[in-house]
C-alpha cells in the first residue's frame, strides 16, 4: 500500500518542486493516519508546501480509491534522522553529526559516524574525532542525520 502511495504522491510533489521522502500508514489510531513526508530541496519546507501537497494528494488518493475506509492524511516535513538526499541537504547540514551506511564494508565498516564536512562528485567527507574520512559515493547506501555527536 505504501509503495502505491509513494508512486501516486511523487508526481504530485514534483508539480510543486517538492520530493516525497517517506510515507507511513499508522493503523493503531482511529481513524488510521497516512503521513507523507515531503521536502523542498530549493528552500525550507513550509506550511504552504504542506497545504498545497495535502489538497492535491487528497484528490489523487480519493480518485484512485487507495483507502476505501476513512483515514486522516497528514503532510509534514521530516525531522531528525532524516536522510540527506540533495545537494542543499549536504550544504545545510555541514558540521552536523551524520551516520553513513555503506552497501558493503568499506575499510572494514558498514557504518560511519562523524561530522559532515562536505560532498563532491566522488566522496562524502566526514570529520571523525579530528580525523578526515572520505567515503566513495558509489559505496554509500544512505546518509542521515545522527542524534549524537562523534
UniProtKB/Swiss-Prot annotation:
Belongs to the RimP family. The gene is rimP. Gene3D superfamilies: RimP-like superfamily, N-terminal. GO terms for cellular component: cytosol. It comes from Acaryochloris marina (strain MBIC 11017). It comes from the Bacteria. Keywords: Cytoplasm, Ribosome biogenesis. This is Ribosome maturation factor RimP. NCBIfam families: PRK00092.3-3. It is found in: Cytoplasm. Its main location: cytoplasm.
